[in-house]
């Protein structure tokens, strides 16, 4: 279906199918911080598999979080229950870019190991890998946490467009490397999530955000898997 071919029925999966709605998820996550669970290959695989076993969905979605790439890159970020991602030192200046190094070959080894374990258990059920889009991840780094109106992010776009572009460029490279690690480990498709991009007017999106999302897709195009972009 993702390759636009005829199928007997539309495939069914849920965006957040692995998570708090499942009692088995709550059991294995008890006492384990979110990002620790994401970076534990065996636990990430188990959580990914849970909704497939329970509901028989047509695809698994790898258990991760959009801030995992920056966590692996060394950014001090935690996921606070009831709040979301919280960044200890928000990004505000050119010097902050040094805290986002270029991806290295082993940066996402734990994620790749989790994907391989998952794929080995899934059989014919495909696995969808994902990453956060550069803009949405940048909004957490700039705001320091969730923000509906994104005042600091919008201010950086308007007042310091070169800094904003440099930040999104680095995040695009991290997202692409994160996706490549998942695909090369066996993911059958990928999705890029831009869950805060709807806060921007269309002009700012086209000028300052879209090129960086396109950069992510360009860096995984050679792998030949279906690619999905989700933005609200």
Language-model segments: what does each one mean?
Residues 82-121, 125:
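A gly/proline- and charged-residue-enriched helix-loop-helix capping module
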Residues 15-20, 65-67, 82-83, 131-147:
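Short glycine-enriched loops at secondary-structure junctions
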Residues 71-76, 90, 138-143:
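Short, conserved acidic/polar surface loops in the N-terminal third of protein domains
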Residues 78-92, 147-154:
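A charged helix-plus-loop insertion that forms the helical arch/lid used to bind
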Residues 30-34, 93-103, 157-164:
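Short glycine/proline- and acidic residue-enriched helix-loop micro-motifs
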């Amino acid at each position: 279906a993702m390759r636009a071919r005829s199928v007997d029925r539309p495939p069914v999966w849920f965006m957040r199918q692995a998570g708090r709605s499942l009692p088995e998820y709550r059991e294995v996550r008890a006492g384990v911080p979110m990002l620790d669970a994401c970076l534990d290959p065996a636990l990430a695989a188990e959580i990914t598999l849970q909704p497939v076993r329970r509901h028989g969905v047509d695809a698994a979605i790898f258990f991760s979080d959009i801030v995992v790439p920056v966590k692996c890159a060394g950014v001090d970020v935690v996921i606070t229950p009831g709040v979301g991602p919280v960044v200890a030192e928000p990004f505000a200046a050119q010097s902050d870019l040094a805290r986002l190094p270029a991806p290295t070959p082993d940066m996402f080894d734990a994620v790749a190991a989790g994907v391989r374990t998952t794929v080995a258990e899934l059989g014919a059920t495909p696995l969808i890998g994902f990453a956060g889009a550069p803009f949405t991840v940048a909004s957490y780094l700039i705001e320091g946490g969730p923000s509906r109106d994104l005042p600091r992010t919008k201010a950086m776009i308007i007042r310091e467009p070169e800094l904003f572009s440099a930040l999104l460029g680095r995040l695009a490279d991290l997202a692409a490397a994160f996706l490549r690690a998942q695909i090369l480990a066996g993911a059958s498709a990928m999705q890029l999530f831009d869950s805060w991009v709807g806060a921007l007017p269309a002009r700012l999106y086209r000028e300052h955000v879209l090129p960086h999302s396109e950069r992510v897709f360009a860096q995984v195009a050679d792998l030949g898997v279906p690619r999905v972009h989700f933005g609200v």
